[in-house]
């Protein structure tokens, strides 16, 4: 087992540590997302044999500290698929797409298939990033893949810190088996680089909730038709 795969023994360090797989097309904001967590930026390390950066992100919860060892592709997805070593021993995953690029959403099923091929039945969160941008192309009604595969979905904006904590809170609850778990300390995040129109975003969130009550599209459409 490589140094990156050897997570701390919970009994020895006193807190649980989980390998978090972060995937998605290049340019969707994965690295920007994990770098918002200040402590993770200071402690990152590079694993050249697999081509990833591993960032330990700590969260203080009502059950004590929880650490996600976040595996970032470091751009390797631009050269084709990721090696199985990236996925092996993964406890959970985040699939990210860019709401201003339909292609990145269209490729979500491929990323999901890669995860499921190596990891058996782990909790997965789908994140639509860059909701602070005005030129949104993936409309609320188009986002249906998570419903087909029973994934959790969040709209996020890495640059504005919008909903940053939600994917981690959901995964921490699933992995600890405590759906009442909560964060007890404010997250140490970098200051927001941009602002987000919260009124407009709330309208979109309402549309997403309404779309969840609608019948799913045919398998080959996957919500990408207008």
Curated annotation (Swiss-Prot):
One of its GO terms (biological process) is ribosomal subunit export from nucleus. This is GTP-binding nuclear protein Ran-3. The keyword Transport applies. Residues 75-91 are annotated as: Switch-II. GTP binds at residues 25-32, 75, 129-132, 157-159. One of its GO terms (cellular component) is cytoplasm. It comes from Oryza sativa subsp. indica (Rice). PANTHER family: GTP-BINDING NUCLEAR PROTEIN RAN-3 (PTHR24071:SF18), RAN GTPASE (PTHR24071). The gene is RAN3. One of its GO terms (molecular function) is GTP binding. GTP-binding protein involved in nucleocytoplasmic transport. Required for the import of protein into the nucleus and also for RNA export. Involved in chromatin condensation and control of cell cycle. The lineage of its organism: Eukaryota, Viridiplantae, Streptophyta, Embryophyta, Tracheophyta.
